Regions:
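Acyl-thioester-dependent acyl-group transfer interface
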Residues: 232-238, 256-258, 302, 308, ...
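DNA breakage-rejoining catalytic core of tyrosine-based enzymes
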Residues: 293-307
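Acyl-group handoff/entry surfaces in thioester-processing enzymes
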Residues: 32, 36-39, 45, 76-152, ...
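Hydrophobic "lid/gating" helix adjacent to the active-site nucleophile
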Residues: 125-141, 279-282, 313-358
């Protein structure tokens, strides 16, 4: 268990008295720890246990050997129609309603300074697309049901153009909002803006139906590894993926249809009730009847002293900084609305299986937290 902690936290070693959160742990890393402990050690572990007993010795002592073997995710028959995951079905439905919307585009812009080996970059993207089926998947409707089709691996189109600093942000935004065609694909767009001979901006855009924030991080990390090798004339072999996203989608459907769907529906209906309250904040203007997805962001920095104080308070209370800040946010909503029943949706990684850690795909889900 100490070795699992050390690997996931990125530290050399973990001692019996070490605290998971003091070593830099957070809820996403905690999820990976629990999945590893369950599947590799066959021990009954939970996120709640890790939060209640964050010190290694106490956490390990509270674990019990499970009699339920963790089943593996089987590989789907690629000769049969490949169903969508439940998350993909939501995205497919939303895209059919608003195919021109960019609300579910996932962008990333990387500044590349220094000499760029474009051939190595091309080879890196080609390797990524060959490695991850989601990067070459499109979607279709047949007989009233939706399916995903994995296409053969082909060379990625990298759109190259010369550009200057002036208007750069606007150009990137224009690239990001270009609509995707989920029926034709591809659902990964790559643009390379050359600002100077040794200065480029790499713009990556994916549709949410094949990706999420975790996936974008995986893609960038693997892109860096591949480019580092190819640019030096080396062959790069990344660890083999145990499954692909289509395998997960089929496994998820089988799992839910075996009784899990009814259990979860009963739980959430009992917790949230039938009617969901609408948060009525004192806006300057009336809420539109239809969401436009137009909005703005206000960024600001927290002082180092405040951040350290938040972390210290969270550790004393046996919680995470996220939970502490969420409680503060909900208190603020109560102050402005006067409503006692406030529900907040927060994204969860939803990758509680070891096989899914390095996959590019749409796993993230929104979980309702009730005050």
């Amino acid at each position: 268990i100490a070795a699992i902690w050390a690997e996931i936290l990125g530290v050399e070693r973990v001692g019996l008295d070490d605290n998971f959160f003091e070593l830099g742990g957070h809820s996403l890393l905690a999820t990976r720890v629990i999945s590893r402990v369950r599947q590799e050690q066959q021990l009954d572990a939970s996120l709640k246990a890790l939060f209640e007993r964050p010190v290694l010795e106490a956490f390990a002592q509270g674990l019990e050997r499970t009699t339920d073997a963790v089943s593996t995710i089987p590989l789907a028959d690629r000769q049969q129609p490949l169903a969508l995951s439940f998350a993909q079905e939501r995205q497919w439905f939303l895209w059919q309603l608003e195919p021109e919307s960019a609300a579910y585009h996932i962008p990333s812009a990387l500044r590349l300074r220094g000499r760029l080996d474009v051939d190595a970059l091309q080879r890196s993207f080609d390797s990524l697309v060959a490695r991850h089926e989601t990067l070459r998947t499109r979607f279709r409707l047949e007989g009233g049901r939706s399916y995903q089709q994995v296409q053969p691996a082909v060379s990625v189109s990298i759109e190259r153009e010369q550009f200057g600093e002036e208007g750069l942000i606007e150009r990137i935004q224009a690239i990001v909002v270009q609509p995707f065609d989920l029926e034709r694909g591809p659902l990964l767009r790559v643009n390379l803006l050359q600002l100077a001979e040794d200065d480029h901006v790499l713009v990556l855009v994916q549709h949410h139906i094949v990706s999420d924030g975790w996936s974008m991080q995986v893609m960038v990390e693997e892109l860096v590894q591949l480019y580092a090798g190819y640019s030096q004339g080396l062959d790069v072999v990344l660890p083999a993926l145990p499954i692909q996203y289509a395998d997960y989608a089929l496994w998820q459907r089988s799992w839910m249809e075996a009784g899990e769907k009814e259990r979860q529906l009963a739980y959430w209906t009992g917790l949230l009730g039938g009617e969901q309250p609408v948060l009525e904040l004192p806006f300057d203007r009336p809420r539109p009847a239809r969401q436009s997805h137009r909005g703005a962001q206000l960024g600001f920095e927290l002082s180092r002293e405040l951040v350290e104080a938040v972390r210290a308070l969270a550790q004393r209370e046996g919680t995470s900084s996220f939970m502490l800040l969420l409680a503060s946010f909900q208190a603020l909503l109560y102050r402005y609305s006067g409503q006692a029943d406030i529900r907040v949706g927060v994204p969860i990684a939803n990758r509680n299986r070891v096989e899914t850690e390095r996959l590019i795909g749409f796993f993230v889900n929104t979980q309702v937290l009730k005050r």
